[in-house]
Amino acid sequence: MKRGIIQSRGLGDILIALPIARAYYERGEEIVWPICEEFYGSVKDSVAWVTWVPMKTDDRGSFFLEQPLKIFKYHDVDPNQALYLYHYLNVAPELTEPELFNILKFDQYKYWKSGVPFVLKWTLELCITRDPAAEDSLRSTLGIKQGDRYAVVSMKGSNFSAAVPQGFFDPNVRLINVDDNLTDSIFDWLGVIEGAEAAVCVDSAVANMIDQMGVVGPKLYWIRRSPWDLTPVLGSTWTIIPTNLPIKDPVRVDPAAEAVKKAQPQPVLQGRTAAQANGGDQSSLTSHVPFKAAGKIPTSFMSALKK
């Protein structure tokens, strides 16, 4: 059987969902997974057991649902058997469970929706094939030698970035920015991260990778950039950095109203919902209303890295 997955972006969400796909793969199913092309380099070799189908992004947002459904048709995937892992698709509310938005965090929701035990989220190591040569090449590019002292930083998320306050680091500790585009695959950074004294990350794909891989070695510092329900459940021992960003965001979804929508018949026309068939703009077809940071990240926590 072929199993399609609807989670075309972002990279952090794809990493969160990989153990879900692996659970179905181990049942003997073929996984067909359309993703936005900018993430393809990270997974095409490291996760070769998935049939990845890279897609171009567009202003209409067709890569959320319309393009994946076309890809499923081409690959003979039954859309009714696909895993729809977005937290919320506002033009297709029948695909989600809005009643659970106030109960589960977004990563818990993906596992609940797919019927996979949440504890498997932290088995990412079993889902990927590391490339030691690529990891060594990256160390060489960065000029890292045995015994070098360094910390890694990742201060960019999908809709958030912060400057690195270098003055708060021990001057003897070199800062290496994981956000620099030095390699096609995020997994090539694993060796560098494992050798670091510390890793300082905003909530991002890099932080998700470190957490889900159970990276041991660096001290871990995590910076929230979203309201509580849109942050992942962390499994490693992180120091959570306080910020003045709001804990709660205005309600994005009215569960009662969405339950009514879901109860209404949603005709499917050639693999598309009625809303799609009507040619509506899908640019707002997102998993949630994007959070816009209203505060700023304090920098005093950086003193924790001083010797």
Positions of the model-derived regions?
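Catalytic machinery of carbohydrate-active enzymes
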Residues: 1-268, 294
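Non-catalytic N-terminal targeting/anchoring module and adjacent flexible stem/linker
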Residues: 246-307
